[in-house]
Amino acid sequence: LQTARLLSTLRPTELVTYRERSDDHPYLDDVLQAEPSPGRSLWIVSWGFDVPRSLARLQGRPVVYQAHSSGYGFGLPPGVPVVAVSRNTLGYWGDRAPRNPLFWVPNALEPQWLERGARPSLSDRDAVTERPIDVLVQKRKSSPYVLEQLVPALQAKGLRVEVQSGWVDDLVDLFNRSKIYLYDSAEYWRGRGVSEGFGLPPLEALACGCVLFSSFNHALADTLTPGVTAHQIGQGTLDNDLVRISAAVASPSQWLPAPSTIEELLADSSEAQWCERWNEILAQLNDLVRHGAMSQMSDMVLRSP
């Protein structure tokens, strides 16, 4: 939905459903019947599990795969460009489809995180004077280690730990009121057999001035540097985690990245930067169409080995 919303600021954009009909959006079968191939539209598919079927239905039309998670196991036909949301995913397709056109546009943070996040600024101003939550954990994607071992041990040490599992009206406010944010998704994604496609929550935490303890699996390694922007969770022993997290609660400023480091990281994740990158890619895709490089059936298109 974010992709459709932001692309609509660059080109006329329509969201199309393909599993169920909707009163709010066109249905794929109807659109394909009304517009003979190849048509004038550029199609973008993104839901990994359905990509092979979607590409088959769109054969003969210009189509782009916006790739989030990797590891689904399918291959791509020649002539289908990939726009990866992480360098981790870019490398995956650079290996599996080296002759397909490859691009990289990381996901964007919503403006509310950049505008309202209470991180220390370059002028040493902190918009938050009170952070009553010592440690924030979001239950979804969290590992059994975090939920069953680390959280109880932190609570036993007297720390106030918030485990968020339901709907929250204002996530920015929740993060702004937290000193530490824990994110450990490696086990979650391993159990699903695919990679962490991007990982926005750690960036959201940094935008709100939280000290970040995180895993570094898959796309998280794109943006997080151990000991600089984030600290490894599950580092060796439970006791080691307890000592480090307790120290960060006692003195968060000693564990935060430099304000300039955070701002540089967040600037690269803004919607403005996203739109600029996509605008450049759309121009390149137009060139590819003119050169016949986006035809899945053309004999001229290079095949990946």
Region locations from a protein language model:
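Conserved catalytic-core segment of nucleotide-activated headgroup transferases in glycan assembly
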Residues: 95, 104, 108-174
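N-terminal pre-catalytic "stem/leader" segment of glycosyltransferase-like enzymes
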Residues: 1-49, 215-220, 226-235, 241-243, ...
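Conserved donor-binding/catalytic loop of nucleotide-activated donor transferases
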Residues: 176-177, 201-210, 215-216, 226, ...
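Extended catalytic core of nucleotide-activated donor transferases of GT-like folds
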Residues: 17-97
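Acidic donor-binding loop of glycosyltransferase active sites
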Residues: 176-192, 210
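Conserved donor-nucleotide binding/catalytic region of nucleotide-linked donor-dependent transferases
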Residues: 245-265, 285-293
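Hydrophobic beta-strand scaffold residues
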Residues: 63, 161, 182, 212-213
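Nucleotide-sugar-dependent
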Residues: 185-199, 217, 221-222
